[in-house]
């Protein structure tokens, strides 16, 4: 939905710098998009003691929020959401972000009205565990045959596969076509 890759990568790089741990590449920072925070830290800060995870997250969030004004919807997303709503098609968000983080972004983008439901990493096991999608299915009275998981990362595709639903990978987000193709259904 939102082009947050530069803000996420910058937040991770600056958090590592402030804590005094080895920097990560932009590509590594991109690779964690979609995961829950507890799964992210071992990748971007592998030597950080678990007792420091909370501090790291606070520092990362501070830097991410500094980039908040630069966040924007990907081209065509608003039009697609309008078309889906006009057609009576239910939409939901399954994200690795926290509820607070999701609410902040979706409110800022002014698109809450286009979604029937949402679930975050602090409400269910993180991607690719199927609990997120299974919970959305149950809450909305839908079956696996009635939904499609759309995502821009391998974690989204793995989530769809784990839940047994059809997936659509979009290539304008965090990772390349070639990378996504390796995880196609």
Predicted regions located by residue number:
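Active-site neighborhood of HAD-like aspartate-dependent phosphohydrolases
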Residues: 1-28
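Helix-loop "lid/cap" segments that line or gate small-molecule binding pockets
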Residues: 15-16, 36-49, 105, 136-137
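Metal-dependent phosphoesterase signature
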Residues: 42-79
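Short, acidic loop-to-helix structural element flanking the phosphoryl-transfer center
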Residues: 66-93, 99-103, 130
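Substrate-recognition "cap/lid" segment bordering the active-site pocket of phosphatases
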Residues: 70, 98-150, 154-163, 177
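Nucleotide-sugar donor-binding loop of glycosyltransferases
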Residues: 171
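Conserved small/polar residues in nucleotide/adenosyl-binding loops
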Residues: 178-185
């Amino acid at each position: 939905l939102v082009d947050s890759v530069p803000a996420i990568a910058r937040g991770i790089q600056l958090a590592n710098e402030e804590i005094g741990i080895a920097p990560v590449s932009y590509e590594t920072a991109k690779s964690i998009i979609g995961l829950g925070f507890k799964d992210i830290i071992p990748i971007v800060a592998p030597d950080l003691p678990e007792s420091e995870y909370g501090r790291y997250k606070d520092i990362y969030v501070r830097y991410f929020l500094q980039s908040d004004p630069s966040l924007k919807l990907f081209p065509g997303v608003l039009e697609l959401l309008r078309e889906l709503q006009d057609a009576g098609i239910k939409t939901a968000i399954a994200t690795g972000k926290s509820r607070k983080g999701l609410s902040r972004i979706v409110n800022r983008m002014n698109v809450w009205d286009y979604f029937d439901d949402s679930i975050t990493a602090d409400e269910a096991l993180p991607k690719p565990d199927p609990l997120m999608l299974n919970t959305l299915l149950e809450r909305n009275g839908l079956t696996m045959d009635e939904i499609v998981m759309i995502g821009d990362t391998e974690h989204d595709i793995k989530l769809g596969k784990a839940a047994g639903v059809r997936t659509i990978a979009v290539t304008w987000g965090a990772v390349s076509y070639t990378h996504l193709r390796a995880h196609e259904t």
